Amino acid sequence: PAIPRFPRHISYDLVLFGSWRRKGVYIGDGRQIASPGSYPVAGFNFAPMYNLGYKFRVGASLDGVYDGSANVYTYMEDYIVDSNGNGTPPPRQFLKPGIQHQLSLGVSGRAEYVMPYFTIGVGIGANVLGRGDLRGLYQILALKIGITRSTFLHIGYNLQNFQTPNYLMLGLGFRFHNKYPK
């Protein structure tokens, strides 16, 4: 049978995701220690994607993230040591900044390879709003698993500055204006 001509079009992907992460915190002398708990991560991606053919999509994405571990810092109270060097340091406290230091909004370029039940996507972007830990470039690798014609499971990973593991993305996606042939 003949393969019908592909109708090039723009579709819109909306992904809502959540996750958790652990974090290392710098303690001043360049060393890191593990923060004692895990932190929530939640976000969204809104991506208009140009469908070039049966196998390839490209587009841009608006990416919003709440990262509960962003800009966490450690604090230790001063303590007195006697002349013999005796003294017990108090435990370190891990402090979270206000929510304005844990939100970011970024823009990324995306490319996706489309298969019958799966789509593999990559992206690179930069946060345009975000403070401290949330500044800089980020990279995304994602797997979309089709559930219905317009919904999919989204499993992805986010790196920061091509080296630092950031967070896992586990979510649900919706595709609007999908003219992909049935």
Kindly give the residue locations of the regions a language model identified.
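Flexible, solvent-exposed loop segments that connect beta-strands
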Residues: 26-35, 68-99
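Residue-level detector of the transmembrane beta-barrel scaffold of outer-membrane proteins
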Residues: 11-15, 57-59, 110, 119-121, ...
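Transmembrane beta-strands of outer-membrane beta-barrel pores
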Residues: 16-22, 64-68, 115-117, 124-130, ...
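Residues on the lipid-exposed face of transmembrane beta-strands in outer-membrane beta-barrel proteins
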Residues: 16-18, 44-50, 107-113, 141-147, ...
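Outer-membrane beta-barrel "beta-signal"
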Residues: 1, 165-182
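Repeated loop/turn-to-beta-strand initiation elements of outer-membrane beta-barrel proteins
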Residues: 55-58, 115-120, 145-155, 178-182
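Residues that define the transmembrane beta-barrel architecture of outer-membrane proteins
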Residues: 8-10, 38-44, 101-105, 114, ...
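Surface-exposed strand-loop-strand hairpins of Gram-negative outer-membrane beta-barrel proteins
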Residues: 20-45
